[in-house]
C-alpha cells in the first residue's frame, strides 16, 4: 500500500494538461515497467492511462493493482487538484492546491539540473523534444528523468510539482521511478473529441480527506 501511495503522489504532477489550440480531447498513454521490475508486481500494474482536457481543466485516470482506480482532476483557474481513489468500493477524495508543494520536493526541484537537448522524435503524431531533469532526493541519491514534450499542442506543465515543472509544453513521454519500480508512459494517441463537463466533477459518494489522513489509514509514511 505504501508503494501505491507513493505512485499516486508522483502522478499528481502529471495531471494538468492545458490546451489552447486543441481546446478539448483525450490522450491515451501506454505504460511499460522497467526490465528489472518484479514479475508479480508487473502483472498487477496498469498497461495504459488516460487523460481528458477541456478549457483549463484536466482528468488523468488509471487503474492500479487490485482494481484500485486512481483519478486526478485539476483546474488551472482555481490552481487546485483533487485525487479520487476507489479502493474496492472505499471512495476518497484528496484535495490540494498547486502551491502546496512538498517542501522537500520543492527544494529538490529548485536545485535540479535541467538540460534541454536538441534530440527530437515523433510521439502520437507530434514532434517532441527531449529534456533531461537531474536532482537529488533527501538522502542525496541522484535521480534522472527523461521527458519528451511538444509545444504543438500548447499544453503547459508549469506550476506542477516534480520534474514536470521544468518542462515547456505537453509531456507525451516520461518515466517515473519509485524505489526499484520504474514506469514509462508514452502517448499512443491524441484524440480530438468533445469532453463532457461531468469528467471534472467530484462524485458525491467520495469522502474528502487529506493525504496525511490517507497515509495514516493505510499505514503509510
Identify the residue ranges that each predicted region occupies.
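Extended soluble regions of mature proteins
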Residues: 20-99, 103-221
